[in-house]
């Protein structure tokens, strides 16, 4: 059963579990569980994805309840009219909030994009970032006896593929658990010492003006047990995830 965090006659939103694909893909033929099909069976009607979340990312994922709504609303979700808030645990400490304006080249998939042009220009990509908490753990990943990590609030202003993961890696503060853009030493430490074997990136909140009622919609999704036990270990108050809204 998926946790439904919002529903009206036009939309339904779930708290996507980490590791679950949004829909069937020929690249992952062995997979049997998908958010789209599970949700369809759960509510008894077809659903139409309005945006994407990478497979390892958890959090708010919104679907339209008809193809007509999907086609009308999709441009809004693709544009700047959505306010998205993510939380991530990253390597090292970032002391001040800021804005990263750093263009990203289109990431091509080795299989799916085999025949796509390799020469596409970089696309504008902007992310707002804000440090919320920090911790120093008594484990070494380098010449120092301890290692530092930080909790970040991230707000993408554009929607490029793997934007937050790539932007944090560009800042030399990769998201813990990122096997593509991250640092294997830190991923291993979290896997072995903190029982956190995956990407620590969560889509906490989505805000938009409802296109049919003109009311502001705020959809929030709680973090799962992996995050909760990390907050306990690091002595971070859970209110950090809602205080900045």
Swiss-Prot record:
It catalyses: uridine(65) in tRNA = pseudouridine(65) in tRNA. NCBIfam families: PRK11112.1. The active site is at residue 54. Keywords: Isomerase, tRNA processing. It comes from the Bacteria. It comes from Vibrio vulnificus (strain CMCP6). Its EC number is 5.4.99.26. One of its GO terms (biological process) is tRNA processing. InterPro entries: PsdUridine_synth_cat_dom_sf (IPR020103), PsdUridine_synth_RluA-like_CS (IPR006224), PsdUridine_synth_RsuA/RluA (IPR006145), RluA_PseudoU_synthase (IPR050188). PROSITE patterns: PSI_RLU (PS01129). Belongs to the pseudouridine synthase RluA family. One of its GO terms (molecular function) is tRNA pseudouridine(65) synthase activity. This is tRNA pseudouridine synthase C. Responsible for synthesis of pseudouridine from uracil-65 in transfer RNAs.
């Amino acid at each position: 059963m998926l946790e439904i965090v919002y529903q009206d006659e036009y939309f339904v939103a779930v708290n996507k579990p980490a590791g679950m694909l949004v829909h069937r893909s020929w690249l992952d033929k062995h997979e049997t569980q998908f958010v789209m099909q599970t949700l369809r069976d759960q509510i008894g009607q077809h659903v139409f994805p309005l945006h994407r979340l990478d497979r390892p990312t958890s959090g708010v994922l919104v679907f339209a309840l008809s193809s007509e709504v999907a086609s009308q609303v999709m441009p809004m979700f693709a544009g700047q009219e959505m306010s998205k808030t993510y939380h991530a645990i990253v390597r090292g400490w970032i002391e001040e909030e800021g804005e990263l304006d750093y263009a990203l080249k289109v990431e091509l998939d080795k299989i799916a994009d085999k025949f796509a042009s390799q020469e596409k220009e970089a696309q504008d990509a902007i992310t707002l970032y804000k440090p919320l908490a920090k911790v120093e753990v008594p484990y070494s990943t380098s010449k120092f006896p301890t290692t530092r990590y930080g909790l970040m609030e991230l707000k993408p202003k554009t929607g490029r593929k793997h934007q937050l993961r790539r932007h944090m890696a560009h800042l030399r503060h990769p998201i813990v658990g990122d096997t593509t853009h991250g640092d294997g030493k830190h991923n291993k430490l979290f896997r072995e010492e903190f029982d956190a074997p995956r990407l620590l990136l969560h889509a906490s909140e989505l805000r938009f003006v409802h296109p049919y009622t003109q009311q502001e919609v705020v959809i929030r999704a709680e973090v799962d047990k992996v995050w909760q036990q990390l907050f306990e270990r690091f002595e971070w108050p859970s209110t950090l995830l809602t205080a900045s809204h």
